[in-house]
Amino acid sequence: MAVKERVGVVVSDKMDKTVVVAIEDRTAHPKYGKIVVRTKRYKAHDEDNRAKTGDRVRIQETRPLSRTKRWTVAEILESVGA
C-alpha cells in the first residue's frame, strides 16, 4: 500500500521535535458549487528541528509516535529563511 503524503505550511514550531503543518483543501460545495477552503492541521515529527514557521514541507504518514502525532516531515520544499 502506498504511503500517504501531504504538502503544507508549518504554522507552529514551538514544540521540541514537533511541528504543526496546515494542509489547505479546496473543494466545490456539492450543492452550490462555490469553492470552499478547508484547513486541517497535523502534528508532524521533526527529528532535527529543521522546519521553521512558514516553510513548505512534505509530510508522510507513519506509525503513531504519540497521542496526536502520526506524521513525519519527509522534506522541506521551500524555506522562508533562505
From Swiss-Prot:
GO cellular component annotations of the record: cytosolic small ribosomal subunit
CDD domains attached to this UniProt entry: Ribosomal_uS17 (cd00364)
GO biological processes: translation
InterPro entries attached to this UniProt entry: NA-bd_OB-fold (IPR012340), Ribosomal_uS17 (IPR000266), Ribosomal_uS17_bact/chlr (IPR019984), Ribosomal_uS17_CS (IPR019979)
Keywords, ordered alphabetically: Ribonucleoprotein, Ribosomal protein, RNA-binding, rRNA-binding
Any one GO MF annotation of this record: rRNA binding
UniProt-listed Pfam families: Ribosomal_S17
Transmembrane region(s): none
Gene3D superfamilies cross-referenced by the UniProt entry: Nucleic acid-binding proteins
UniProt-listed HAMAP family: Ribosomal_uS17_B
PANTHER family: 40S RIBOSOMAL PROTEIN S11 FAMILY MEMBER, SMALL RIBOSOMAL SUBUNIT PROTEIN US17M
Function: One of the primary rRNA binding proteins, it binds specifically to the 5'-end of 16S ribosomal RNA.
Protein family per UniProt: Belongs to the universal ribosomal protein uS17 family.
Subunit and partners: Part of the 30S ribosomal subunit.
Protein name from the UniProt record: Small ribosomal subunit protein uS17
